[in-house]
Each structure stands twice: as structure tokens, then as C-alpha cells.
Amino acid sequence: MRENSESSVACHHRVGFLGLLVTLGIVFGDIGTSPLYVMKAILHTGETINQNTILGALSCIIWTLTLQTTIKYVCVALRADNNGEGGILALYALLRKMKRKWIYLLAIIGASTLLADGIITPAITVTTAIEGLESISSHLPVIPITLGIITIIFFVQRFGTESIGKSFGVFMLIWFLLLGVMGAFSITSYPLILKAINPYYAIVLLTQSPEWFLILGAVFLCTTGAEALYSDLGHCGRKNITISWLFVKAMLILNYLGQGAWVLNHIQTASSVNPFFSIMPQSMLIFAIIMATGAAIVASQALISGTFSILSEAMNLHFWPRMRIKHPTHVKGQLYIPVINLAMYIGVVLIILLFRDSSHMEAAYGLAITITMLMTTLLLGFYLRTKGVARIFILLFMGAYCVIEGIFLAANLSKFLAGGWCTMLIGGILFLMMYVWVHAIKIRQHYISTKPLDDYYQIISDIKADESIPKYACNLVYVNHANKEGAVDDKLLYSIINKQPKRADHYWLINLEFADTPDTLEYCCETLVPDTLYSITMRIGFRIEPRVSLYLRQVVEDLVASRKVDLRSTYPSLRKNGIPGDFRFIIIHRVYYPESSNNRQQNLLMTIYALIGKIGIDEPKALGLDTSMVVVERVPLIINQHNRSIRRIAQMEEEK
């Protein structure tokens, strides 16, 4: 049983003009809009503007793009794929069977900070683009226009972006050409700016400038979109991203150099304007603002879609509660999560209203994504170890990038009070939610008691044959939460045998296994008692929704076609007309009672878990079951059973 919707993805993976064009529209929106605010942020650090400062800052930008984006992500991370998929959670899925059980912490820290970055990116990119209007008139309402565009971006998510998404690649191609051409044109006014390619100027700046920490914090903004290259690996493929990056990097560097040239030609006024718009000819300013706004929308769209994908993966990895996921288009992988869309919209609006302009947002930007990159570095080190890479290379790689990213982290921490606290607060809340969810699931799983299933074959067969028991359903389906082969959840047996004996023609036990690979969707079926009891194991990839009803229907059709089971109704009037028997699902839901445990920390964790669960959906919907065919049986989750003996007395005495 496998999904058959790979053709569009395979098309995007082919190296060719179309594949490269699609890659430009999907992958490079975030990093491609960095020129809107990086140089402006550098000029606002308070460092004296002179040739050495600008050459040093530009050299830092060029070598950050080279070391961080090109070498770490393009050359190394893109090779660490999970069946073609990339991103920090896909990387973790490859490693979660390692003996180091704490490795999940790296994944949820990285995912939390990456999601926090997804709140600030739409705010700063759209705001900076609209602020270009101030070059035309200082009286234009930047904030209302920005909020209007943000509202439209989030509103259209429910309809999908398939139709306009096809044009993103063409738009971004024009955008990058605009960056490169305008940058190259500006360079001609100050050719000495090309000296910034020499890393010597970066070293001089970092060793001599008293404001080097602040400058590095601003420089880091040029590579914040690097993580997207890795996260979008599954959409476009390694070769398309690698080849496209050569073009994108060249255009970005030309634009940064062009902005630097303009600054050195206008040292007195440079800090009061945005150099990005200043290098544009006056006749092209409106066009540049429109293009910048469009690029900001593309970048925002990529971040929103990326957030949906990350949380979808987190659900199957048991990092996040199940939520209602919609598929607004037929494009594979395009998701829409209504609750998250609303939460992101509120978050972005609050960021815009709180910081008011892009200069203040720059202080909030960069800190969270630095932590994500550091977590990716650590996970990559473990991955390289599993691939048998020489230990000396792993130590050099991890040591070098832990130092580089550690310095960037320290530099960005200098902006904590000015705004960095905001994304760290968001990331901290998300981390707490994931941490609680992971541990609560472990607690629930730990206290599920199981029994050997084969001990109950006979009694289940006897119940089926006992016509004095009213027939509950023709086909009775349970999801078995026992994670041991040959075992069954004892509450499941209690439901069939003790609570209300349930007679059925066939009993089906569904075992769900979430695979470490992204697109796995397969099953195996074992007949435990002929014509009575069946066990179906479904293996589901971490990017696939567990739509159990749909998959079971396909499984049953396969079994009927191969004549391994006869599902025609046992009622004579229905059987002679070939009508199949009905299906009924029973879900065993364990309810945690704090008074069953003396562990206060555990009680607090489970209480928070219950609160977090309210933002999700119930188990029948989470498993994609037809709720009209589902019965939920609630049972207590017993942690520590306190059995107190009751004393027998001869006669009750009256109370005085």
C-alpha cells in the first residue's frame, strides 16, 4: 500500500531549467530578501562608517555566506538526506534509534527555535519592503499597509497557493537578476569595494573594532535563510539547490557589494536611509518596491508552508499533538493547518505592532535561528558518525562550526534585551510544549499493561460462536497500543471480554508503526485465528498522515481480492445480495487522574499535557476514522495504585 503521487515531486527534482526555476521560488525566498535589511542593520550598530568598517563588514558577509551556507549546508547538510527529505526533524528521524536517548532534545530545541524564526521573518521582510515607500513620501502609512499584506498572505493559505505558486520561480528569477544588476551598476561607482572579497578585511574588523559583536549580529542576518535550503531538500532535490545557489550567491554578493559602494560614496547620509533602495535609480524605485514586496510575500509563503510541514512531521514523531490538517490542493506535501495559521497570523501582527519598524525588528531577528543552526551542526556530527566518516573529520567539522555558530550566538545574545527576548520567549514556549508532550507520551506508554495475545485466541473464538451474546458488529476494529510483538493492550481485552462481551464475525487489531523514513506507507496482515482474528501492522512515514479508515479499506479490498477473507454479511438477507458486513471502531482512551500518583513533578507534567492536548484533535479524528463508526471507551490510566485494606467489623456503631 503506497501513495502514488510522486510524479510532480520527481519533476521538481530533475535538473533542468524548470527544476531550477521552481527551486528559486521555493527555497531562496528567505535568504533572497536579506539584502533588504542586512546593510541597514550594520549601519545602525553605532560603528563609525568608514572604508575599513564597510570593507570588513562586507567581507564578513561574503565569508559567512561561504562558510555557513555554501560549505555547511550546500556541501555537507544536503547530503544528509532521509530518503530525499531534509530538515532538522528528518535528520533526527535517522538518528532516533541511537543509544543516546537525549538526542531528541537537540531536535526539539532546533525545531522550536526554527518555528519561532517563522514568526519574525514575515514581519521583518514585509515591513522592510513597504518602508521603501518612505523614499517617495514619509507620510505614507507603512504599518497599516504591512498589516493589510500580512492579512492577505495568511488568509489565502486556506485556498492553497498552487496557481500562484507556479509563478514564484519566475518572479524570484527577476528579483535575483534585479539584485545582481543593480549591485553591479553601483559597484562601478566605487570599484575598490571588490577588495572586500579578501577575508583579511573581516579579520581586521573583528580584531580591531570595539563594536564587532554588534556588527556580527547584523552580518548573521545574511544567512538566516540557510536552514531553508536543507528543509526544502525534499521539494527540489540536492542538485537543483546546489546549482541554483551558485547563481543566487553571486547575485547576493553583487548586491551587498553595490550597497557597500553606495555607502562609501554617501558616508554622511548612509545611516539615515536604507542602502538597498538608495542604489536604485529614481525612475526604478516604484518597481523596486513592488519587487521587494513580492519577494517578501514569497519568503513569507515559504516560511508558513515550512511551518506546516515541520509540525506535520513533529506530530508523527510524537513531538506535537495531532491537529486537523487540510490539503487545499493536489500538490503533494502542500498542507494547511488552520489553528497554526491563525496562531502565526496573530503572532506576526503582534510583532509588527510591538516593534513598529524593521530597525527594531532586526534586534529580534537572528538569535533563534542561530540556535537552530547549532543544533543542526550537532545532529550532523552524529549523522556523519553513523556513516563511518573519519573521527578526525567529524571533530574538525563540529569544532569549527560550533565555534563559528557559538560566536554568532554570543553576538546575537547582545541583542537580547533590545528584542531578542521575543523570539526566545516564543521558542521557549514551543520547546516546553514539545518537551512535555514527549515525556507525557512516554509516561502513558510506560503504564500500559499488556498480555500475550495467544492466551486469548480461544475465548475470542468462543465469544464469536456464542449466539446468546447480541452481535455488536460484523467487523470490530481496535487500535492496539502495545508496542511488543505478540502482545495486546489489556484494556482492549477487557473491552472485548469483560466490560460488555462483544460478539463479531471478525476482529481486527491495528498496530501503527511510525517509520524513520518520510514517505513509507505499507502494511502486513497476519491471520491469528482463521476467519476470526486478524492483526494488521501499518508502517507510516513521518510525513504521511495516519488515515487509518482509508488505509484499512484498501487493506480489506486487497484481502478480499486475494480471497484471504470473506467479508460478506452473515445476515442471510444481506449475504445473498453480496452486501459486506459493517465495521465498528473502538478506541480505548486512557484518562490520567493526578490523585493516582504521589509524584508532583509527574502530576504537573501530565496536567500541562492535558492543557496542550486541547489545541489538538481527539484520537478518532487524529487517526482519520469515520466518527460515525467509532465508540470511545474511557478508562483510567493507573500510575500508582494505592490499595488500602478495608477492615471488617461486626456491626456499625452509631456516631455520638
Label the model's feature ranges.
Residues 2-656:
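The structured alpha-helical core of multi-pass membrane proteins
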